[in-house]
Amino acid sequence: MVTKKSKKAWPWLWLSVLVILLDQLSKYLANHFLSLGHPVKILPFLNFTLNYNTGAAFSFLGTENGWQIIFFAAISFVVSIFLILWLSRTSRSEIMMSLGLSLIIGGALGNFIDRLRWSYVTDFIDFHIKDWHFATFNVADSAICVGVFLLIVYMLLTPSSKP
């Protein structure tokens, strides 16, 4: 029996798995070598500061009584399924789209794992300029941001086939 080689972007899911592994490893290391709320200076503009986020980006809804954990876990899971289906219908030749989708999937599932295991997401990357600090984030958040950026660029640069 001869099988036809798939031209779909499924092989890009390896990148999602790599993002999940790097995210979970970095969070494991942060939890074992950092103390909650105590910054470790890496560069003049970068600290590693362990924080636990029960909300979403910028700790949105982080002070609620717990329902938000299930809510954000469900959103992460549903969005990941949707993006996996989108990736399954994407041509392997659409590299920027495949790369963006894979990064977002890996990031969303990395944070999903944290929410299921701990009821919070571990954040530790702390960029700052003097006393102004950006929201503390993690590898999964970075992958999501880069993935969204790539999708936006792809959509802006790719001519639409619609009239």
Curated annotation (Swiss-Prot):
Keywords: Aspartyl protease, Cell inner membrane, Cell membrane, Hydrolase, Membrane, Protease, Transmembrane, Transmembrane helix. GO terms for cellular component: plasma membrane. The gene is lspA. It is found in: Cell inner membrane. This is Lipoprotein signal peptidase. The active site is at D123, D141. It is a multi-pass membrane protein. One of its GO terms (biological process) is proteolysis. It catalyses: Release of signal peptides from bacterial membrane prolipoproteins. Hydrolyzes -Xaa-Yaa-Zaa-|-(S,diacylglyceryl)Cys-, in which Xaa is hydrophobic (preferably Leu), and Yaa (Ala or Ser) and Zaa (Gly or Ala) have small, neutral side chains.
